Design a protein with these regions (language model features):
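C-terminal nucleotide
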Residues: 1-63, 88, 92-124, 220-381, ...
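A short glycine/serine-rich beta->alpha loop
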Residues: 53-54, 70-77, 116-124, 154-162, ...
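Glycine/serine-rich anion-binding loops at beta->alpha junctions
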Residues: 59-75, 155-172, 376-394
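Structural signature of FAD isoalloxazine-binding scaffolds in flavoprotein oxidoreductases
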Residues: 76-96, 215
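Beta-strand segments within the central parallel beta-sheet cores of soluble alpha/beta enzyme folds
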Residues: 100-102, 147-154, 184-195, 334-339, ...
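Glycine- and acidic-rich phosphate- and metal-coordinating loops
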Residues: 135-157
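Phosphate-handling active-site elements
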Residues: 140-148, 176-192, 397-410
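Fold-level recognition of mixed alpha/beta catalytic cores in primary-metabolism enzymes, strongest
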Residues: 160-248, 430
Length: 430
């Protein structure tokens, strides 16, 4: 194991270029940026924790949701891809029983006393709660984990729908798993992270975000048994055909304060399920749902029923998307992407907040996307939890410049990201 200074010198000399190229691509422009980024993270670690420490460096990717919008928490199907935007963490084990994490862009140093295992008052919805919950998740699996000091630098947009929280969680989980020799596999780490987010952070999320960050590539998951989801990895290479670019636009309205809106989707879907004798919609007979619509409208309300309709139709669509990708039929996949986007808007109703109709950044971005991409073979949809954050578009290369210019005219310079899918999940890089 090398010290932070030794790693900085090795990175500058190009000794880690192969490892960086495997994650981000091998162009000199990309490598130069990542050398600088990793070097800066190591330097910041030294600033906060002192020089001479032996360290390891980890990477955990963000993800773009390709299908299955709000289906995973109902024990349905999910489809997502890891992206090249990631969180980098520099970490060193300590023996004092504390976890300390300083994250770029945040003033506070998170300090977690591991003798305090229970959720702490006032800590929910803060990163400290995730760290504490992840450590306790390891202990619940019989892992004897302890303290570490870490600095993180994330390029995953916070509150954007690219799952910055899952990248952060997986970074912390990778540190504990590696530094303390736990040997847990990627799905087990993902479940620990979901436990922390649900129980300690207080967000009722599904598992797809964490699984995609953990496993990498394009991931199809069947959550019929959420404790042991069936996972099928589709290799990232070849998913996008030549001449097609994945663009993600940040509408620059964070959804980080929208936990209540997200919870309402899950609660309303589960209210419909309860009326049909299930806990979640994945346990409900779809034919019976359609037969009992009048009663369900009266008992649960129209929005809950529409959200249940979205679940059933989106679930079938996600399965068809997987099959299209496996067959190399991007045209069929793109048509399904469009239908998914329309269902999120019309049925799931998570494109804007009904309580704030003046603010509809996602709606505007989708409307402009449709005006540019309709009939071109491209596709567009909102992604992630919704209400704010990002939209996703598959843009023919000939239209990328025009498309990005249109998005930047609405949301400002640098809002439109040209992304690549990433084969690797969360890893120790060096």
């Amino acid at each position: 194991m090398a010290t932070s200074r030794q790693l900085r010198e090795q990175i500058a000399a190009g000794r880690w270029d192969a490892a960086l190229a495997a994650l981000y691509g091998g162009s000199e422009e990309v490598l130069s940026r990542q050398r600088s980024r990793y070097g800066a993270a190591l330097e910041q670690f030294e600033l906060y924790y002192g020089p001479g420490r032996q360290v390891q460096v980890y990477s955990a990717p963000g993800r773009t949701e390709l299908g299955g919008n709000h289906t995973d928490h109902q024990h349905g199907y999910g489809l997502a891809g890891a992206v090249t935007l990631d969180l980098v963490a520099v970490a060193s084990r300590n023996e004092d029983g504390f976890i300390r994490v300083k994250s770029r862009g945040f003033n506070k140093l998170d300090v977690i006393d591991l003798t305090e295992a229970e959720p702490q008052q006032g800590e929910s919805t803060h990163s400290a709660s995730l760290i504490r919950g992840i450590a306790e998740g390891f202990r619940a699996k019989g892992c004897d984990v302890g303290g570490f000091d870490a600095y993180t630098a994330s390029d995953v947009l916070r509150g954007s729908g690219l799952s910055s929280s899952a990248a952060f969680e997986m970074g912390v989980a990778m540190i504990l798993n590696t530094e303390y020799g736990c040997g847990l596999d990627a799905p087990a780490l993902a479940r620990i992270c979901q436990f922390a987010e649900n129980t300690y952070f207080g967000k009722p999320s599904g598992l797809l975000d964490q699984l995609t960050s953990a496993v990498g590539g394009v991931l199809f998951a069947d959550f019929a048994d959420p404790a042991a989801p069936k996972i099928e990895k589709i290799h990232a290479d070849g998913v996008l055909p030549d001449g097609m670019t994945l663009c993600v636009t940040d509408t620059r309205a964070s959804h980080s304060e929208l936990t209540g809106e997200f919870a309402a989707i899950r609660n309303e879907m589960e209210a419909v399920a309860a009326c049909l004798g299930g806990k979640v919609l994945g346990e409900v007979d779809e034919k019976r749902f359609w037969q009992e619509l009048p009663r369900l409208r009266e008992q649960c309300g129209d929005r809950a029923v529409l959200r249940a309709i979205h679940y059933f139709e989106e679930n079938a669509r996600t399965l068809a998307q997987r099959d299209a990708l496996a067959a190399g039929d991007f045209a069929a996949f793109a048509r399904l992407v469009e239908k998914s986007g329309h269902s999120s808007f019309e049925c799931c109703q998570n494109v804007y907040c009904a309580s704030s109709p003046k603010h509809q950044g996602l709606s505007a971005a989708l409307a402009i996307s449709q005006s540019i991409l309709a009939g071109t073979g491209g596709a567009w949809r909102m992604q992630g939890g919704g209400f704010a954050g990002t939209i996703q578009a598959f843009v023919p290369d000939a239209l990328v410049k025009r498309y990005c210019a249109a998005m930047e005219a609405l949301f400002g310079p640098g809002c439109c990201y040209l992304l690549s899918l990433r084969e690797q999940g969360a890893v120790r890089v060096m």
